[in-house]
Amino acid sequence: MSAPVPGWRQPIAELRYLAATVGHVHGPTHPDMATLAEVVATLADSHGDDHAAHVALARRMRELTDGFNPWSGACGSVHRLYQSLAPIADVLSPALPEHS
């Protein structure tokens, strides 16, 4: 009997192409987008239950996207990618509450 597949696996696999496209189009002016595409691909390709690695990748996505806040003038694809990645990152590594 195999273990159940985590709910984030299918969405991250589906976002792989969008992340690669955003990285290709925006990478020259926003280098973090090329890195983000690599992080998404790594997470999509990950196997097993390496929770520590998944947490690290989720945190890296959050860092690269400035907390999933698109830059001023970002295209719709960037907005869609960020909006889709944020809940995955929250499942893998819940954001720490901000201090007042």
Predicted ranges, named:
Residues 33-38, 55-59, 75-83:
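Short, charged, amphipathic alpha-helical segments
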Residues 63-100:
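Amphipathic alpha-helical binding modules
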Residues 2-40:
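Short terminal alpha-helical segments
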Residues 41-69, 98:
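Cationic, hydrophobic amphipathic alpha-helical membrane-interacting segments
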Residues 24-30, 48-51, 70-75:
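Charged, low-complexity interaction regions
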Residues 35-49, 85-88:
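Short amphipathic alpha-helical patches
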Residues 4-12, 46-51, 72:
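Solvent-exposed, well-ordered amphipathic alpha-helical segments
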Residues 18, 22, 60-63, 74:
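Alpha-helical protein-protein interaction elements
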